[in-house]
Amino acid sequence: RSAPTAAAVRKAVTAMTSKTDAGDYLRMLGAAEVVNLREQELGTRPLEKAIWAGAIDNLGGDILGWFTRTVQPYGNIASIGLAAGLELSTTVMPFILRGVSLLGINSVEVPRDLRIEVWNRIANDLVAPHIDQIAHREIALADLAEAFPAYVEGRVTGRTIVNLA
């Protein structure tokens, strides 16, 4: 969902994925460029070449640390996931020499009033041109356990709606 939202606010979006067959799908959602995460040299220096204006990181771990070292001056990084690890290995250099900001996103504890305000903003002000084309599927709650392996193996693209009825 990050690619269409960023595209809606007129930023050039580079989507990064480890799924080699996802390029056309991500470009359809608004990515100007698609790069393979597995081909990125994460480096180990306190500051690497400044590449990104900002980042939305779903993975955490080494990738999040790399983003802190490669975001351009005054860029923001939104950390929204931890699938690649809980640890963050970096220095203070990106924060004090480049003014990079790291924003932790906790969507679970958001008060109801703020949640409604944010969803209204997304629905009315940040509508991406291809939002209806985000891949999605619906499964019954009873089928959830058998669906998990595909997620663990990285074979799922898009969103899954669990029907509780």
Model features per residue range: what roles?
Residues A15, A53-I56, N76-S79, G104, ...:
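Short catalytic-loop micro-motif centered on adjacent basic/acidic residues
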Residues A8-I63, N120:
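Adenosine-nucleotide cofactor-binding segment
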Residues R1-T5:
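Rossmann-fold NAD(P)-dependent oxidoreductase module
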Residues V34, L102-G104, E138:
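Conserved beta-strand scaffold positions in the cores of enzyme catalytic domains, especially
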Residues I116-A165:
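C-terminal hydrophobic helical "lid"/dimerization subdomain
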Residues L26, D62-H130, N163-A165:
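Glycine-rich phosphate-binding loop and adjacent beta-alpha segment
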Residues T17-S18, R38-E39, N58-L59, A83, ...:
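Short beta->alpha linker loops
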